[in-house]
UniProtKB/Swiss-Prot annotation:
Gene this protein is translated from: hemA
Pfam families: GlutR_dimer, GlutR_N, Shikimate_DH
GO biological process assignments: protoporphyrinogen IX biosynthetic process from glutamate
Superkingdom per UniProt: Bacteria
Full protein name: Glutamyl-tRNA reductase
Alphabetical UniProt keywords: NADP, Oxidoreductase, Porphyrin biosynthesis
Annotated signal peptide: none
Length: 435
């Protein structure tokens, strides 16, 4: 088996270069077609995310002496399809083969190679990449589901999916918050029994607020307010979130939002504070001092620190969240060690399956070859008999030729073992013959 993965990721390349080598769906289909036409691989899966672009190629016909040239061809194709000079890729492009490639794919799918350790989204992206490749081969060849990606590459990806599921089940790799937005939402779940009946106020409309909104909506929040200086940006964010449970406020309406909110998460670029002690005091009077969580992620801060003096106000800053994140990252690091052990086990299991498959293929090929020899000699013998030749003579010739032809390949193998000094192989061969 020859599986090659080549690619770049957030560790090896800048955002600018990663953008250049990204595959749109249309470009991905074109790439799969090119690889097939150039005979670079029998089957290919292309993974393209904001943090990585990787091409997984399977070519079972590559011989050891052809390997280096094949890799060069694949790299040249990768540069050509993205219209990039090879020199621009030299320090950024990595490639792995066979066992290293299998381990790498499993690490990627389990989130061990991600920007955020253990992030779960990558598994869905790997599954989607595999599904797109399957659909391409089905359409390209006009065949049913039985004739798609090569069995080796298919088995590898199926094994990878089950490995990722096992890692999620048996370790805590995805349990703890390791992003500021997620940590803020996790605090809310710790302080309040349920988020579903709470009113949430988000101040700002940037990436962190978007992530926080997605987390909250995923946990069933039914009333979400977004306050932002520029209404157009808030509207654009609401359009992306596609939820009917969001209300937009202007900053002049911020006090109204505070009067209702059980959780406030603020992340703006304002040079001055937006939420003062007096505003929170008024809000708490309106709220009859029900508990409120204020998470100030902004730098400089959006919320006056003195609000901690108010009753039932839980106030956290970005530094507090960073401490939580650092602790959680430490926990994920421990879980990642367990995940690596699981990956090593599953990788070994995949190669054990591959050995059995290759042995079965070898045996089947040898038996088919032997049957072809038998059929050829049998036809000749039958023709000789029909011509009235001696049956004893024909049977003797048939059996002698059959023996010589069938023993030719094993004899060559034994001669090679002798030349290579493979005494163990010869001993195993001899023990089988004696049986």
């Amino acid at each position: 088996m020859t599986i090659l993965v080549l690619g770049i990721n957030h560790k090896t390349a800048t955002v600018a270069l990663r953008e250049k080598v990204a595959f749109s769906e249309e470009k991905r289909l074109s790439a799969l077609n090119q690889i097939e036409q150039l005979k670079l691989a029998q089957s290919t899966v292309i993974l393209s995310t904001c943090n990585r672009t990787e091409v997984y190629l399977h070519n079972k016909f590559i011989q050891p002496e052809q390997n280096s040239a094949w890799i060069d061809e694949c790299v040249a194709w990768f540069a050509a399809i993205h219209q990039i000079q090879l020199t621009d890729l030299q320090d950024c492009l990595y490639f792995y083969q066979n066992q290293q490639a299998v381990t790498h794919l499993m690490r990627v799918a389990c989130g061990l190679d991600s920007l955020i350790l253990g992030e779960p989204q990558i598994l869905g992206q790997v599954k989607q990449a595999y599904q797109l490749a399957e659909e391409y081969y089905q359409r390209a060849h006009g065949l049913g589901k039985s004739a798609v990606i090569s069995s080796e590459l298919s088995r590898l990806f199926q094994k990878t999916f089950s490995t990722a599921k096992r890692v999620r089940t048996e370790t805590n790799i995805g349990e703890s918050a390791v992003s500021v937005a997620y940590a803020a939402c996790s605090l809310g779940r710790q302080i309040f029994e349920s988020l579903q009946e709470l009113t949430i106020l988000l101040v700002g409309a940037g990436e962190t607020i978007e992530l926080a909104a997605r987390h909250l909506l995923r946990h069933g929040v039914k009333k979400l307010m977004i306050a932002n200086r520029t209404r157009a940006r808030a509207e654009a964010l609401v359009a992306k979130l596609e939820s009917p449970f969001i209300e937009i406020l202007s900053l002049s309406e911020l006090q109204d939002g505070l009067n209702q909110a059980d959780i406030v998460i603020s992340s703006t670029g304002s040079p001055t504070t937006l939420i003062s002690y007096e505003m929170m005091k008024q809000a708490q009077i309106q709220r009859r001092y029900r508990p409120v969580l204020i998470v100030d992620i902004a730098v400089p801060r959006d919320v006056e620190e003195s609000i901690v003096k108010l009753d039932s106000v839980y106030h956290y800053t970005v530094d507090d969240l960073q401490n939580i994140i650092n602790h959680n990252l430490s926990e994920r690091e421990k879980a990642s060690e367990q995940a690596e052990e699981i990956i090593a086990e599953e990788c070994a299991a995949f190669f054990e399956w591959l050995k059995v498959r290759q042995a079965s293929n070898l045996i089947r090929t040898y038996r088919e070859s032997a049957d072809e020899i038998r059929q050829e000699l049998l036809e000749k013998a039958q023709f000789s008999l029909s011509q009235g030749e001696s049956a004893d003579k024909i049977l003797d010739e048939f059996s002698t030729k059959l023996m010589n032809k069938l023993l030719h390949s094993p004899t060559l193998v034994m001669q090679t073992m002798v030349k290579q000094g493979d005494s163990r192989g010869l001993q195993n061969f001899l023990s089988v013959i004696k049986k």
